[in-house]
């Protein structure tokens, strides 16, 4: 059975990420972001959202593990910042129901959502510049880089919250990540 850990970066929806994976039949565990990287035994990692970069614990070190990583909201931002991209204040801050345009139908994480999907966004900062090796896979009117992927390294990020009920195809994002982690 595929095992995916959800790293708690103190976000308000982290428990919903764990529940979404559990409901898909994934062997999942919610772990504290102070867990040493060498103690992680998993086929994949979800870096949860959270309030700010000052409370991300060992999350940057998890990017060095040789397993797929999905960053959600702050998780995507810390991935971009740690791997050489740039994060800054967004033009739109707060909560929003957003229509996201999928730019890469072949992307293993979100390509199946093409041509567009409705999502729930809740962020003040966003990725402004992609790290080397990443492609922008989704965009919207309120956020230029809504999703990014580096399929060579199995690193994926979404700025929105697929775990929230207001996101219309959120479960599909988790299904796709489960399949990536299982090698399907």
Swiss-Prot record:
GO terms for cellular component: cytosol. The gene is guaAA. The keyword ATP-binding applies. Heterodimer composed of a glutamine amidotransferase subunit (A) and a GMP-binding subunit (B). Catalyzes the synthesis of GMP from XMP. This is GMP synthase [glutamine-hydrolyzing] subunit A. Pathway: Purine metabolism; GMP biosynthesis; GMP from XMP (L-Gln route): step 1/1. The active site is at 73 (nucleophile), 161, 163. GO terms for molecular function: ATP binding; GMP synthase activity. It catalyses: XMP + L-glutamine + ATP + H2O = GMP + L-glutamate + AMP + diphosphate + 2 H(+). Keywords: ATP-binding, Glutamine amidotransferase, GMP biosynthesis, Ligase, Nucleotide-binding, Purine biosynthesis. InterPro entries: Class_I_gatase-like (IPR029062), GATASE (IPR017926), GMP_synth_GATase (IPR004739), GMP_synthase_A (IPR023686).
